[in-house]
Amino acid sequence: MSPNFKLQCHFILIFLTALRGESRYLELREAADYDPFLLFSANLKRELAGEQPYRRALRCLDMLSLQGQFTFTADRPQLHCAAFFISEPEEFITIHYDQVSIDCQGGDFLKVFDGWILKGEKFPSSQDHPLPSAERYIDFCESGLSRRSIRSSQNVAMIFFRVHEPGNGFTLTIKTDPNLFPCNVISQTPNGKFTLVVPHQHRNCSFSIIYPVVIKISDLTLGHVNGLQLKKSSAGCEGIGDFVELLGGTGLDPSKMTPLADLCYPFHGPAQMKVGCDNTVVRMVSSGKHVNRVTFEYRQLEPYELENPNGNSIGEFCLSGL
C-alpha cells in the first residue's frame, strides 16, 4: 500500500475524531502497536488466502479491506464510532451480525450505511445510488436480528455505533460476493486500469480515485443500437442521455464536485488528462437504451507533477486543498 494512500485513509480517521471533538483518544502508544492499514497489504491478503477466517478486535475508529470476523467490546463509553469497509471493485460487501449486546433503550446504536459518508458527503451520491438516502441506513435497534445480513450496493460500506456500558459490544462477519457489473466504486489503489460497463440500465455510475492522478481514457462506447452508432448531435452533451464526465474535488460526493470534461461520443484511442484534486471521478450517465462502456487507466501524480503542471492539466482550483 502506498504511503500517500495510507495518509489519505488516515485523514478519514482524523476527520472523524475532529468532528466529534475527541482526538485525544488517538494516542501515540496505540499508533505504535496497531496499524489498521496493514489490512490493505497484498502480502497479508495472500497469506490469509485459504487459511482459517481472519479474526481481530474492531476499534472505535477503523478501516478494513479483508473478509473475516471482527469483535468490538467497549472498555469505556464509546459514543462516536465508525468503521469503513472496502473490497475489490468487482465485489459486494455483506455485513452479518453474529452477536450483538447493546442497550438500545439506553442510547446505544448500531447502524449500517450503504456506502461511505464523511462530513455530510456521501459516496455514492444520492443521485447515483439505487436507494433513497433514508433507506441506505439500516438501524439494528429498529430491525433487530430480523436482518442479520446486509449487503452493500457497491464495494464500500460502513457502520456507525455507540456503546455506553463497558463490556457490551458486538461481533460481525464481513464477506464479499462477486459483482458482475460494478457500478459505483472507490479504488483501493493509486494506480490501475478499469472498464466500467452499464448494460441497458438507466443509472449513473461513478468510479472514485482518492488521489491526484493522471487519467487516460483509451476506449469509450456510447449509444449503440444493434451495432450501429447513433448520429452525432451538434449541441454537445446537452440533451444526450448517455455520456461520461470527469469530475474533480476535495470531498466524497460526486454531485458536489466540479465537472472537468464531458465525453459525449464514442472514440478509440487515448485521451489523457492530469487532475490535481484530492478526488477524481469518472462518472457514466446512462439512459438504459444502450450498452455503454468506458476503459481507463490511472496513476498517482508525482510531487513534481503537482508543483509544475503542464500539458493537458486541470487542477489549479484543487491544488490549495492538497
From Swiss-Prot:
UniProt keyword Manganese present: no
Keywords of the record: Disulfide bond, Glycoprotein, Secreted, Signal
GO CC terms, sorted: axon terminus; dendrite; dense core granule; extracellular region; extracellular space; microtubule; multivesicular body; nucleus
Superkingdom as given in the UniProt entry: Eukaryota
Pfam families linked to this entry: CRF-BP_C, CRF-BP_N
GO molecular function terms listed in the Swiss-Prot or TrEMBL record: corticotropin-releasing hormone binding; peptide binding
Cysteine disulfide partners in this protein: C60-C81, C104-C141, C183-C205, C237-C264, C277-C318
UniProt KW Glycoprotein keyword: yes
Protein location: Secreted
Family classification: Belongs to the CRF-binding protein family.
Protein purpose: Binds CRF and inactivates it. May prevent inappropriate pituitary-adrenal stimulation in pregnancy.
Protein's recorded name: Corticotropin-releasing factor-binding protein
Species for this entry: Homo sapiens
